[in-house]
Amino acid sequence: MNKFALICLVAFAAPGVATAADTTPPAAAQKAVLVTGASSGIGRKVTERLATEGYFVYAAARKEEDLRALDAIENVDSIRLDVTRPEEIAAAVEFVRKAGRGLHGLVNNAGVAVVGPLTETKEEDLRFVFDVNVFGPYRVTKAFAPLILESGGRITTISSIAGILSRPPLGAYSMSKHAVEAFGDTLAAELEPKGVKVSLIEPGNYRSEISRNASVRMGLGPDSPMADRSRFPEPDDVATAVVHALFDANPKRRYMVVPERREAELTIGKAIEELVQLNERQPYSYDRDELVKMLDAALGRSQ
């Protein structure tokens, strides 16, 4: 099946007998979402969840076999899209525009990693990570922004708790996700006054192919211990957070989605530690009561 082909499903049913097709919204009403990096891991899980719930998904991937697999899912059209290739991004925009469904949501999910000490990381590997993880969302968001603004829709970017934590040997990946955090915050400040809600999803340790792909790139092979993430749970909770960010009337700016309390404790603890460092022996510092007052005010705004 051509990767850009629309899948037309025609159901014949006796009067008064409901079928699965009856639950799918008509094209004009069926909200559409573009998901990058949809071939596996979080992207695949998000694609399947959205399609199952009756939304239409433009599922972006690079490899022909992945495109065919995505096309086999009801309510999904695959799009060949490498987020590092502007010409493929432009072609994807044109395809979505011509399809006539509009675009309610964008999920920037495509991501890569490399491992190793920063002082030993090759510049080309660092550029590779930033090209996909930082410039990728920037390119795709910039290209699809007119369609999202037109629909008053949502932009959701998959960040990571690594965008808050900074731990070896994932320094390059963590650098890129810190940049994604700034990207999301700035985008929200720019677009929310125009009616577009922006969210960041910060997953912890879930099952995905990112470690395997990183292991292969670093010459460690697909079967190295570092590549094995089978001990981690499937990212169902991450998909739930994405759906909430895309369609809830009151989406959150940030969704920290972790499989265990320890990861949450480490992440929140790191944010608090940075707060203490910012306040410690500085030209303008605040005592405990003043900090608690600031915290209470922030908690009040989040209600």
Regions found by a protein language model. Give the residues of each.
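Active-site helix of classical SDR
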Residues: 141, 176
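Residue(s) in the substrate-gating loop at a strand-loop-helix junction
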Residues: 160
